[in-house]
Amino acid sequence: MVECSGTQLWASGRPFIIHGFNTYWLMSFAADQATRPRVTAAIAEAAEAGLNVCRTWAFSDGGYRALQTVPFHYDEDVFQALDFVVSEAKRHNMRLILSLCNNWEDYGGKAQYVRWGKEAGLDLTSEDDFFSDPTIKSYYKAFVEAVVTRINTVTNETYKDDPTILAWELINEPRCPSDPSGDTLQAWIEEMASYVKSIDPVHLLEIGIEGFYGLSTPELLPVNPDEYSGHAGTDFIRNHQAPGIDLASIHVYSDTWLPHSIKENHLQFVDKWMQQHIHDAANLLGMPIVVGEFGVSVKDGKFGNEFREDFMKTVYRIFLSSWKEGVIGGGCLLWQLFPEGAEHMDDGYAVIFAKSPSTLSLLANHLRCLEC
């Protein structure tokens, strides 16, 4: 297992640094025999490039080929697809961060949970009721238990005992703007972190937040990209002080967070955002930092690949410097890497292995820096 020791990660008695990537659709592709080879290709090509951790969805709530068809009921074929993903990662010595829900409607998420609640007759008025309604929380807990205690049909290993899984993630990018005080989301994080740890006390646990500072640290609100983000119901410091949380998680998306397109300003923001969170993870929280997502979209022509690579270099440089100085451990996961044949899933952020030699060279250089 990968373990925490202060601000550092360790595995098999050696320091472990995350040099990772996101490919969120692995389970969905594995559920279809026609697209399953893309799963193997994604993991194999990433491993060949020297990457060691993949963050992916372990949820799909309602809709087409859902893992969770309705509360308390799961599609065994899709569960076996997730088994395949985990087994392929194991075969290629790739660790996984498995996210258990989504703040957004993609693949169901909290909106689908609330729809299920309304269909069951609950008086719900907002998607944010996901975080407070007892029945909705029971749906989520049941799903978490089903995943964490799952026995893999390929490896015959229980997920909670499998070292292939580096960490569980409670929810991707949670926000609760209906309660900008942060109390609602904080209570949910504390409850769910305790619940996950009661089932699986061994694996590491992260929240999945973007890293916005909240009302517990008003002096840090100016670090946020805009005024709204300080009222999204999240709080980087307070959220990560919840018992059971092992890793400080942040995302970095200056291309969508900042309204302008002045490239130098974006890189300055990234520098400040990274430096502040690394400082706080090390000195206020005492835990490693995981940049769970970072990237730049080249879809609308606002930015090109040259800027994307400058952006990546900035993220890697700042983390590497802090790690070399012994300040922090953890690592960074690019959003996102694809094999050929999956281009139709590109949201503008995808780096296609076979079509991105300069980006692969950048990834290789970061690996060399981590190893030297």
From Swiss-Prot:
Molecular function GO terms recorded: mannan endo-1,4-beta-mannosidase activity
Native source species: Oryza sativa subsp. japonica (Rice)
Catalytic activity from the UniProt record: Random hydrolysis of (1->4)-beta-D-mannosidic linkages in mannans, galactomannans and glucomannans
Superkingdom classification of source: Eukaryota
InterPro entries referenced in this protein's UniProt entry, alphabetically: Glyco_hydro_5, Glyco_hydro_5_CS, Glycoside_hydrolase_SF, MAN-like
Entry EC no(s): 3.2.1.78
Keyword Hydrolase tagged: yes
Keywords for this protein: Glycosidase, Hydrolase
EC class: hydrolase
Expression across tissues: Expressed in stems and leaves and seeds.
UniProt cross-references to PANTHER family, sorted A to Z: MANNAN ENDO-1,4-BETA-MANNOSIDASE 8 (PTHR31451:SF46), PTHR31451
GO biological process, one term: polysaccharide catabolic process
Binding site for substrate: W57, N172, Y253, W335
Active-site residues from the entry: E173 (proton donor), E293 (nucleophile)
Protein name: Mannan endo-1,4-beta-mannosidase 8
Family matches, as SUPFAM superfamilies: (Trans)glycosidases (SSF51445)
